[in-house]
Amino acid sequence: MIEPFIYPVATLIAGVDEVGRGPLVGAVVTAAVILDPARPIVGLADSKKLSEKRRLALYDEIVEKALSWSLGRAEPDEIDQLNILHATMLAMQRAVAGLHIAPDMVLIDGNRCPKLPMRSQAVVKGDSRVAEISAASILAKVTRDREMTELDREFPDYGFAQHKGYPTAFHLERLAALGATEHHRRSFAPVRRVLAL
């Protein structure tokens, strides 16, 4: 049983989540969403627990109904320079900065917050407990999955559309056989090993 979340007192709450910390390739993508209480969205949940079809339908509904939404990202070279944690925090800051309405409270999935110019609170399992974070997780996941499908067209031998860049056995085998693309994260151990050969 997931513990229900008690919302802080605030006028405009943004939810923030990230997708893509674990993959060996591509950007880490974040989203920030301020929902409109007058236009509720039914069925918001952690993006990982939704079917792709449901995620896509909710993505369109969130984009249409949210008071404000924004995407942020950190590219592979930034991940390599900063490390994945700091790059994720930077991408979250970018998502919040991109909102055209400034929230007075930001709820962030996980156990730590980036430095922000407004109040913020980390919420463990927030993508299952907080509607705004669920919405952000859906926007971030759909966006990153689409990017991996695009990358798959550019590099069809790696299987990016299937594994989304995560270190599956197939991805590791392709990496060993073909080498790293320019989009691979060079600081991640499996990529580093291939580059050292």
From Swiss-Prot:
A cellular-component GO term for this protein: cytoplasm
GO process terms (BP): DNA replication, removal of RNA primer; mismatch repair
Gene3D superfamilies reported for this sequence: Ribonuclease H-like superfamily/Ribonuclease H
Keyword match rRNA processing: no
Role this protein plays: Endonuclease that specifically degrades the RNA of RNA-DNA hybrids.
Enzyme Commission designation: 3.1.26.4
Cofactor binding note of this UniProt entry: Manganese or magnesium. Binds 1 divalent metal ion per monomer in the absence of substrate. May bind a second metal ion after substrate binding.
Cofactor: Mn(2+); Mg(2+)
Protein name: Ribonuclease HII
Native source species: Serratia proteamaculans (strain 568)
All copies of domain RNase H type-2, residue ranges: 11-197
Pfam families: RNase_HII
CDD domains recorded: RNase_HII_bacteria_HII_like
InterPro entries: RNase_HII, RNase_HII/HIII, RNase_HII/HIII_dom, RNaseH-like_sf, RNaseH_sf
Key word Hydrolase present: yes
